[in-house]
């Protein structure tokens, strides 16, 4: 350029060695100078030139510089460092059909899915896209296919989504310390410029969402895609190949989200939440109301529950049980009721439920606020004519679940006739909870139901490894509740 020559730094260093070597030869040819001070100085200059070729400026030697005063790059300078020959050209290099971007959390993705920006996907899948356009006769030539991609974004997006269903991508995060640092995912087209990643696969990559970047590669050949689907798919790599420990564990944003779903607001603030105090017939009505923004996530609501429920007595409030007082089993005379239980349990009458009817004094007079039932059979008159105008009777159960107490029955007596009625036939279970806790329980239930399917898909058939996975998940849940209790206290 402009009559100037560009010379490599190595050529300058080799040139200096050649010049000094020729100078030393002249001294060696003259016997009078073979042992002189000038010849020893020439030997030293040659040695310094060779040292500068290997590592410029080593051991206090005057470094070689160009006309601008810049240090010349020696052999060691060319090999070492991030821009060196090994790291830039051998250990890592720029390849076709690859990209790089920042990762962000994608909570709505499946475990084996990732979100690829549309701008990046157009470049990565360009050979598949152009081939599809030409096969479907949407364009005649390569140039016209490229023009169609630029001018018809709606058609291109539709074709791109169909192509991405059968073409996986490989995600990698440096440094790749083990083989699970390179996994296959099914791509989904997303807006923006960031790659969406499921938070559960972060431990395998040792990644987080504070600005980490990941590389994307597209396997081109059929054999490479088949290997990615079979061996490298994220949902097929649940356990660490080195230790057998599970890699799919909740962390970071997921733990924070679980805590937010199950947190308890202060009583004075929970009453102000939208929808607090509402009653729902089942869980589906709660989810429907929440999706329609009719209730707040932390609103205290009452839900009718059928089935087995468990609560931790030191954390959750007791369950509320409602026994309907219908005319089928209760008459105008006193009824004698027997509770048969396999273990001691206790029922407490809710006095506040009768305050509007002025029945607190009557309940106290009839010795009704507390009914202790021990093992075996205990008879106690708990109903009178005075209470038959009620629609139901509310009681608290201090055990996990009144409906699931073994062999629990109520015996209704009318004269000499007794009707044995199972307690679940008479009771309706109402729970005081929040929509957030319902969502959390549904998520945990779905995860537990799908856990055997995930284990069956893995190649680990030993029961020991399966038990380690189950125990690790249970331990993680226990640790979460311990942290939650510590935060609440």
UniProtKB/Swiss-Prot annotation:
Main location: plastid
Binding site for Mg(2+): 208, 210, 212
Disulphide bridges: none
Cofactor(s) named in the record: Mg(2+)
Any one of the GO BP annotations: DNA-templated transcription
Record text on cofactor binding: Binds 1 Mg(2+) ion per subunit.
Reactions performed catalytically: RNA(n) + a ribonucleoside 5'-triphosphate = RNA(n+1) + diphosphate
Subunit structure: In plastids the minimal PEP RNA polymerase catalytic core is composed of four subunits: alpha, beta, beta', and beta''. When a (nuclear-encoded) sigma factor is associated with the core the holoenzyme is formed, which can initiate transcription.
Protein name in the entry: DNA-directed RNA polymerase subunit beta' C-terminal section
Species, as recorded: Chlamydomonas reinhardtii (Chlamydomonas smithii)
């Amino acid at each position: 350029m402009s009559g100037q020559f560009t010379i490599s730094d190595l050529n300058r260093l080799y040139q200096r060695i050649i010049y000094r070597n020729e100078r030393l030869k002249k001294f060696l040819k003259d016997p009078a100078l073979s042992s002189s001070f000038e010849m020893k100085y020439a030997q030293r200059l040659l040695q310094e030139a060779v040292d500068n070729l290997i590592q410029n400026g080593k051991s206090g030697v005057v470094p070689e510089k160009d006309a601008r005063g810049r240090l010349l790059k020696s052999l060691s300078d060319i090999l070492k460092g991030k821009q060196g020959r090994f790291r830039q050209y051998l250990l890592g290099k720029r390849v076709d059909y690859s990209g790089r971007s920042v990762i962000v959390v994608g909570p709505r993705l499946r475990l084996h899915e990732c979100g690829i920006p549309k701008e990046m996907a157009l470049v990565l899948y360009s050979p598949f896209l152009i081939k599809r356009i030409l096969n479907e006769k949407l364009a005649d030539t390569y140039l016209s296919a490229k023009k169609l991609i630029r001018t018809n974004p709606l058609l291109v997006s539709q074709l791109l989504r169909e192509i991405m269903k059968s073409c996986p991508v490989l995600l990698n995060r440096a440094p790749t310390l083990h083989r699970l640092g390179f996994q296959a995912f099914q791509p989904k087209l997303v807006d923006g410029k960031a790659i969406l990643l499921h938070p559960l696969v972060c431990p395998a990559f040792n990644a987080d969402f504070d600005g980490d970047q990941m590389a994307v590669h597209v396997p081109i050949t059929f054999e490479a895609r088949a290997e990615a689907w079979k061996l490298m798919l994220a949902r097929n790599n649940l356990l660490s190949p080195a230790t057998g420990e599970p890699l799919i564990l909740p962390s970071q944003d997921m733990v924070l989200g679980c805590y937010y779903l199950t947190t308890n607001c202060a009583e004075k603030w929970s009453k102000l939440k939208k929808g607090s105090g509402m009653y729902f017939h089942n869980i589906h009505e709660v989810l429907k109301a929440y999706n329609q923004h009719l209730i707040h996530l932390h609103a205290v609501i009452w839900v009718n529950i059928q089935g087995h429920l468990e609560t931790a007595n030191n954390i959750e409030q007791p369950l509320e049980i409602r026994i309907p007082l219908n005319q089928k089993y209760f008459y105008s005379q006193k009824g004698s009721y027997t509770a048969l239980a396999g273990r001691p349990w206790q029922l407490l009458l809710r006095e506040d439920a009768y305050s509007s009817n002025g029945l607190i004094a009557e309940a106290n007079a009839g010795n009704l606020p507390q009914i202790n039932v021990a093992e075996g059979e205990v008879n106690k008159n708990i109903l009178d004519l005075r209470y038959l105008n009620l629609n139901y009777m509310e009681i608290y159960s201090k055990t996990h679940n009144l409906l699931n107490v073994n062999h629990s029955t109520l015996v209704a007596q009318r004269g000499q006739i007794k009707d044995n009625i199972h307690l679940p036939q008479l009771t309706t279970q109402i729970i005081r909870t929040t929509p957030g806790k319902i969502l959390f329980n549904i998520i945990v239930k779905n995860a537990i139901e799908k856990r055997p399917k995930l284990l069956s898909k893995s190649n680990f058939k030993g029961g020991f490894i399966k038990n380690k996975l189950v125990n690790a998940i249970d331990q993680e849940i226990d640790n979460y509740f311990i942290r939650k209790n510590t935060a609440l206290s």
